[in-house]
Amino acid sequence: KLVKEGNDVDWLSIPVRELGVGHKHTVMAEGGNESFRYAFDLFYSNKVGVMKGSKRDNYGGGIRLQYNLKNLKFSNYASFDHLKSVNSPYGSFSSYLYYNPYYNPYDENGNVKKVLYSYEYYDRGITSKTMYNELYNAVLPSKNQQTSNNFLNNFSIEYDIIQGLKLKANLSLSVDNGKTDVYKSYENTEFLDKEKKGSYAQSTSNDFSYDINVILSYFKSLKKHFINLGFVYNLQEKQYDNTSIYVVGFPNANMDHVSICLLYTSPSPRD
């Protein structure tokens, strides 16, 4: 019947972009004199994926300062990086490999159909089989994205206290945080046989670390003999905080906040 209707749908082209254009911009500058130097850079890049709706936005920058004042030298470099990745609402490309060209994803009014095809057959009784439309899930409210932020600061100082006696110190500071959000509408075909429809999975990570390194050294030459003394102090700390939640049951497709749910639960292996 479907073949006679004359449908010839190129399913593999539906979730794929015809043309993807990305761009990248960078600005750099430096200057100063013998006692003071500076440099900074800013960047922004946008990359679009092969699947419709997928993209990666990345921006950030850094600044470097360096001072040379007689017997005192110190420098500092600070940088920030932000990345946001958005996955395609069309799901996995492999899902479209199993659709025959005579399956029409649209009804007579041009609306996306929820069910592509259903039929009944006899197997120790009457059994029905239904094939759902992956494109239907693509047009529903959804969210599948990751964001991350990274801040890094490196500070170093070098001081010649007296001839032969030198102090060096370094401080490294790093702050990282990330967030992942995956929301599926209660109308998604995944929840047809489930009591609690709609789901939201959210995970957050917050990492903090620092590293302090201090070196005090003394060197002196006495004719054929040398005196070399050193003191090293190192302090490190790393903190990790990761949280994951999975909630189900959303009364409205446009209510996509984790607090608007009926139940906190754990995802099944297939989720």
Label the predicted regions:
Residues 15-17, 24-50, 60-68, 75-77, ...:
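Predominantly transmembrane beta-strands of Gram-negative outer membrane beta-barrel pores used
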Residues 1-7, 49-54, 60-150, 168-266:
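Surface-exposed loop/interface segments of Gram-negative outer-membrane beta-barrel transport/assembly proteins
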Residues 22, 33-34, 68-72, 160-162, ...:
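Outer-membrane beta-barrel channels and translocator barrels
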Residues 153-156:
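Alpha-helical support elements that line or immediately flank enzyme active sites
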Residues 267-271:
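A short, hydrophobic C-terminal helix/tail in secreted or cell-surface proteins
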